[in-house]
């Protein structure tokens, strides 16, 4: 880690400021008790930036992010900006340009079900009795979402539309290397998801992944067609470690994995470029319906910070301690409203304080 690590904090909209406040408590612990030299700078993004600075992604925010080592993001968007043209809404005008500006080609979505929370999963109890821990590694800049040509045609009283799935070899190589490197620090298993029995792009995908795998003989590689993968995740999620996916398939599979954990309020995510610059954010949205009620689950934001510490700072032991602090609080039965089956639940700040105490005291 650098002597002085700079983090751009973008709280954003909805519950973003509330959950970010709890993550900032963890940052303060890292400075005071773990003696990390951290420089925290806060900037506007999303709807709040529109209100304060006139645009969803102000130049000051972009410059601040450029001068940082990592970005910690809350959430953007909400119903109050739905009256704006689509291209000016916070989600479109802030997140997409931010990801594009930093060439974030990969997205990591952990989907972990703690045994203590297995009752939340929609899957049968015998399937999730031991929990599961899956990491979805999704290619973020190629594939059918960005392939050209694409279009919508209304001609001779007939309508048709078309999209193009394109993958370049280098795009597959770099995402495959990332997946295998991540697997080395986990259970050393990569399952690559494709549709190579139908799609030419998937034939290349499988061919390239196989080639890259030879450089990681200690990691076991398997392949599944996307339809079978969707079934297997429901049937036995614990069989998986790292899932390597194209843009489209990763979009679908990561949401499926998130759903079977029972609460998206528990799930962090990270996106990287080739220089390992990262954007870390909760997998969920801005949840404007519970904004200001102090009932949002801050765990996804705190675990996003843990990912920043692990992958951005390369401080695995400290990240492990943050993860353990969250786990310890859950083991003791503490819950926020989204993961509680009764009215006996903690407020956002109370959950944050308990995790802070657990991190400081190691219990």
From Swiss-Prot:
This is 3-isopropylmalate dehydrogenase. Belongs to the isocitrate and isopropylmalate dehydrogenases family. LeuB type 1 subfamily. It is found in: Cytoplasm. Gene3D superfamilies: Isopropylmalate Dehydrogenase. It comes from the Bacteria. GO terms for molecular function: 3-isopropylmalate dehydrogenase activity; magnesium ion binding; NAD binding. One of its GO terms (cellular component) is cytosol. It comes from Buchnera aphidicola subsp. Acyrthosiphon pisum (strain APS) (Acyrthosiphon pisum symbiotic bacterium). Mg(2+) binds at residues 227, 251, 255. The keyword NAD applies.
């Amino acid at each position: 880690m650098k002597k002085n690590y700079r983090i751009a904090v973008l709280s954003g909209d909805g519950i973003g400021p509330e959950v970010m406040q709890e993550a900032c408590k963890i940052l303060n612990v890292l400075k005071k008790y773990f003696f990390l030299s951290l420089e925290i700078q806060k900037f506007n993004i999303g709807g709040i930036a529109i209100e304060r600075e006139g645009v969803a992604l102000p130049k000051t925010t972009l410059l601040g992010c450029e001068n940082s080592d990592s970005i910690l993001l809350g959430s953007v968007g909400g119903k109050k900006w739905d009256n704006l043209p689509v291209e000016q809404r916070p989600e479109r005008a802030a997140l997409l340009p931010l990801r594009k500006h930093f060439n974030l080609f990969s997205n990591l979505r952990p989907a972990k079900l703690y045994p203590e929370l297995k009752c939340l999963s929609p899957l049968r109890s015998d399937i999730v009795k031991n929990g599961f821990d899956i990491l979805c590694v999704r290619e973020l800049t190629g594939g059918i979402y960005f392939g050209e040509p694409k279009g919508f045609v209304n001609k001779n009283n007939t309508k048709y539309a078309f999209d193009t799935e394109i993958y370049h070899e280098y795009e597959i190589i770099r995402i495959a290397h990332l997946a295998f490197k991540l697997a080395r620090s986990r259970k050393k298993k990569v399952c690559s998801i494709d549709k190579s029995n139908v799609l030419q792009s998937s034939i290349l995908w499988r061919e390239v992944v196989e080639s890259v795998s030879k450089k990681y003989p200690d990691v076991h590689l398997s392949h599944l067609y996307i339809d079978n993968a969707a079934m297997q995740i429901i049937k036995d999620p614990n069989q998986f470690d790292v899932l390597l996916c194209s843009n489209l398939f990763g979009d679908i599979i990561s949401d499926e994995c998130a759903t079977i954990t029972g609460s998206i309020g528990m799930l962090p995510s990270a996106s990287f470029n080739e220089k390992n610059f990262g954007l870390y954010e909760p997998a969920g949205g801005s949840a404007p319906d519970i904004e200001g009620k102090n009932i949002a689950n801050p765990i996804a934001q705190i675990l996003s910070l843990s990912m920043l510490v692990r992958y951005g700072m390369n401080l695995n032991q400290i990240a492990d301690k943050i993860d353990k602090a969250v786990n310890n609080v859950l083991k003791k039965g503490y819950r926020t409203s989204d993961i509680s089956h009764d009215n006996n639940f903690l407020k956002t700040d109370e959950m944050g304080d308990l995790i802070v105490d657990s991190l400081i005291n190691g219990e």
